[in-house]
Amino acid sequence: MQARGTVKVQGDANVDGKMSTGQHPHHQHLNSTQANATTTALEYRAMNRPLYRGPISHNIISEMAEGFYVLSGGYKKLFIPSKDVYALMQNVGMHLTEEEFHDALRVIGQSEPQNADELSFSDFLLLMTREVDDTMADELRSAFFHYDKHKTGYVTRKQFTELFATLAERSTPEELEELLAVAEVDETDDKIDYNRFVNELTSRVNCM
């Protein structure tokens, strides 16, 4: 499983999802300026992420900054239309209804009607990485399917430990114990309800 699940939006593009590779002359300036402005928020989010994930990396910030630049029409704008962000999310596989999209805007603090039409880079970053968390949940659940051949909804403690020990970012023994605690498993349990585990992780992330 590729833990990041990030959406790469590169080069010249319109909002129909057709992207071409390439760098922009203002890209580097945009990255550094916006990254500095969101450092504190990112550090806070990193502390609250599930143990199998690392903090948001510079690469993720760079990719999101490039996407923001593309949606701004190639100009260094402070805000972009939220409707363009919604269209982009639809075209890169983040299938939300309009109601779900507006719910997500409320979660990131865009609850006021006068603010809902435009997003700053910080809002864009929070929104896109939040949706990545949902993609992560699907990827993690799919990883459990590898062990649950008969789709019972359960894996053994050994299989659970093996899964997290073989991920790209291997969990330490201490982290595995914490993950087992999230799964509400004690030493006498051998079966783990992985759907409940994934849902609990998702719930914790969404409460950030």
Curated annotation (Swiss-Prot):
One Gene Ontology molecular-function label: calcium ion binding
Region forming the signal peptide: none
Domain EF-hand: 64-98, 99-134, 135-170, 171-206
Binding site for Ca(2+) 2: 148, 152, 154
Chain sites annotated for binding Ca(2+) 1: 118, 123
Keyword match Acetylation: no
Cellular compartments per GO CC: myosin II complex
Location of region: Disordered: 1-35
Alphabetical keyword list: Calcium, Metal-binding, Repeat
Record remark on domains: This protein has four EF-hand domains, two of which may be functional calcium-binding sites.
Record's protein name: EF-hand protein 5 variant 2
Organism name: Trypanosoma cruzi
